[in-house]
Amino acid sequence: MHNVSTTTTGFPLAKILTSTELGDNTIQAANDAANKLFSLTIADLTANQNINTTNAHSTSNILIPELKAPKSLNASSQLTLLIGNLIQILGEKSLTALTNKITAWKSQQQARQQKNLEFSDKINTLLSETEGLTRDYEKQINKLKNADSKIKDLENKINQIQTRLSELDPESPEKKKLSREEIQLTIKKDAAVKDRTLIEQKTLSIHSKLTDKSMQLEKEIDSFSAFSNTASAEQLSTQQKSLTGLASVTQLMATFIQLVGKNNEESLKNDLALFQSLQESRKTEMERKSDEYAAEVRKAEELNRVMGCVGKILGALLTIVSVVAAAFSGGASLALAAVGLALMVTDAIVQAATGNSFMEQALNPIMKAVIEPLIKLLSDAFTKMLEGLGVDSKKAKMIGSILGAIAGALVLVAAVVLVATVGKQAAAKLAENIGKIIGKTLTDLIPKFLKNFSSQLDDLITNAVARLNKFLGAAGDEVISKQIISTHLNQAVLLGESVNSATQAGGSVASAVFQNSASTNLADLTLSKYQVEQLSKYISEAIEKFGQLQEVIADLLASMSNSQANRTDVAKAILQQTTA
């Protein structure tokens, strides 16, 4: 059960019912209070009815109708009846107040109309009198002009007679006649002057009356204008005061819609300008980071390629030396020596019969297909490595060519060492043939420095091999010499592998530095890309927000239109009730 208070919005119901002067605010508050009380009472009655129905259903599934005497109204029913009567009284009171306002407004309009008629009559009367006096005044002015003209004519005639009299003989009859005419004209002139004086006096009187009437007319016109302005101001003030709460809310809603629309548009423009500026800056930053990333990647790739070539070359050399060392520890050298001896004998027989060495012809493709490309590859690798270290291009090319030729020669020397301990004569013959080919290659590579070196290269290689064997102990015990050679070569392999590992590690570190810089630039580029994507998202959100605000504005306009339509319908209904 709701606790219903008899006071709503600070206006007791008893005071409202007994009040003889109720304003719009009071009536509106009373209507709201009555409607709220009515709703609460209906809710209580519905709840009680539901409780009774539930109890009846719980007692029996079938309800048998019973005839009972009508009950008197309980407290809730009496309150509902009271509220209904209150709503009816307040409605009649509101309608009565509106009728009284309309009646007062009609009376005010009638009084204003009557006053306007009075002003109109006075102004029309004064205007008619002024027009009459104006016509009389014009007539008197014409009379004055005629009188002045008549007096002037008489004066001219008198002057002519006086001139004639002065010329005549005093005793002549004509002079007497002219004297009598002069006297008559003088009498007429005096009469004309007297008439003019009367006309002038009357004209002045009419002029005075016309001036008074004109002033009265101007005064009435000013009074009428002041009254009209005051009435218009009062009517405008009354119209403004007569605006209801709904109309004021409608006006406020229209102002609010205008402000929201303007602010929404300006906000969207500012957001778009800001986002565009940020996108331009991010775009420039991304282009710069992209260029830096590409440069770092190119550096890393170039270093990897150079170090890879160096590693491959060193690895190949170490592999060859390892094979040579392994040959000294097993029986592979004997088979290789036998093959070498057979080749040398066969080559001698063929050369004696035909005059051509097939060994030289057989080694030619190897030099063309293997040794020369190897020397060129080594020369290019050393040249690029030196250029990377800052050496001049011409000097780097020359030094690289020499180092490449030396490296290729070392490969051939290792091949000669392979069979040197088994068959010195075969090795010498093999070295002689290889020496000729190497001599030709080195002569083409550095002609000024090695111009006469090819003819003596076979002896030089043979003597170098002999000195190498002697240095390593090849003149002593053959088995011990092989072991010593194998040991030294294995040590050289280990040292070379260490150098190769260090070189590759250094290259890897340098490459990692470039890759780290490239990764940093790539991270900055990715971050800038993400920021650009976020800016695009913010732009979409700003446009979506603008659309949502436009929908809110449309809803407000629809609400305002509906409110105005409802107000018009209520006004029509009230007008119909008033005129009924």
From Swiss-Prot:
Annotated region (Mediates interaction with human MAD2L2), positions in chain: 61-70
InterPro entries: BipB-like_C, IpaB/BipB/SctE_N, T3SS_SctE/BipB
Ranges in coiled-coil conformation: 104-224
Keywords: Coiled coil, Host membrane, Host nucleus, Membrane, Plasmid, Secreted, Transmembrane, Transmembrane helix, Virulence
Membrane-spanning residues: 313-333, 399-419
Disruption phenotype: Deletion mutant shows fast constitutive secretion and displays increased adhesion to HeLa cells. Mutant is non-hemolytic in the presence of sheep red blood cell (RBC). Mutant displays normal secretons.
Protein name: Type 3 secretion system translocon protein SctE
UniProt source species: Shigella flexneri
Name of the encoding gene: sctE
